[in-house]
Amino acid sequence: MSRTRRRRPRRAGVMTAVLCTAAVSAATLPAHAAPQGRILGAGAPGSVTGSYLVTLEEGTAARSAAGRDLAEGYGARISHTYGTVLNGYAVRADARQAGRLAADPRVASVVQDTRVALDHTQRNPPSWGLDRIDRRGLPLDRRYAWPEPAGAGVTVYVIDTGVRTTHRDFAGRARHGWDFVQDDRTAQDGNGHGTHVAGIVAGTSYGVAKKARIVSVRVLDDAGSGTTAQVIAGIDWVTRNARKPAVANLSLGGFRNAQLDAAVRTSIASGVTYTVAAGNEGGPAALYSPAGVKQAVTVGATDRQDKKPAFSNFGSTLDLFAPGVSITSASAASDTARAAHSGTSMASPHVAGAAALYLAEHRRATPAQVANALVKGAASGKVAGRGLGSPNRLLQVPRA
């Protein structure tokens, strides 16, 4: 009996401790704790932090005192009340306040606000390629529409024969990076290929991304020839000096070279998006470098009828196609000259420009995310005679 009596206080003590713990735990719960509802579009591209669109259920009018009190009761500040096209309002609130508002049964939905921008249109673009990449199907409509900010803030590195940076179509947005042919800081173009490519990327008249910056990295001589060592040196320079967000275009290639492919992969891993020409041999792109690099965006060519020309390489290595026959762009002959050329060299810079458009609105996107967005946004089922294993995807520029 004595043992039993001595145990009771201990049991009581244990019980008291448990009850005290429970009491403390209950005391730590905030008095204002409330369920959190779902915020639609939270964190989506272009979302506006702290701004939400609220739609109310039919039983509560947004313009009524009850409607106003509903939002304000959760700490949200109404910035605009709708009453005709939408029974709701725009509010300023933090994420917790918005979540509590979304959980209220009188609220139909809470959607995070997003930014909207103009689509700018160029009438009668000088290149049919521009006309094609903003339309999911033929016929062409003699217009090219692109989203602002038109590639502003994005740098595109043209690893090529150099660029005539003084050409008027660049409007002061092109500069020299490095010349690995003559080993100096003036990467001028004595061939014309690089200037033509740069014009497709970012020319004011001829370009896809009309406000992107161009940096010339010369790795090919005036005859359009160079060594793998020079190309790798150019890629190495871009990787070390890239001003991000950044895109690099390689409208060049040769037979498979493990070192060149590794250099491109390493540069992509550093955060630079690469667009590369599939090649003009009319064979499998997988046989050539850097077209065979899986992490790069490899581009085949199409003509005005959405057909793959005989010269364009093909195969599963390709990510998509873009215009590449009789493409008009800037010429290195003078500061106002233009020329028309064909090749996957012309197709790839269309995609580089589209990548710049995307990065201007998604500045933290990784190269893989950029590639995925371009592939997903491409028009499917349009390319005729695309070649064994090739994807049936044709470039479309991102829309605002």
Task: Label the predicted regions.
Residues 143-176, 184-230, 242-247, 286, ...:
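Subtilisin-like serine protease catalytic core
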Residues 58-61, 85-86, 96-98, 114-118, ...:
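Solvent-exposed loop/turn segments at secondary-structure junctions
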Residues 35-45, 68-81, 86, 102-155, ...:
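Protease zymogen maturation seam
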Residues 123, 224-231, 252-322, 326-352, ...:
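Substrate-binding/specificity loop regions of serine endopeptidase catalytic domains
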Residues 52-55, 90, 109, 155-159, ...:
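Structural recognition of the beta-strand scaffold that forms the well-ordered cores
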Residues 2-119:
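Primarily auto-inhibitory N-terminal propeptides
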Residues 34-42, 46, 79, 212, ...:
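C-terminal subdomain of the subtilisin-like protease fold in secreted/lumenal serine endopeptidases
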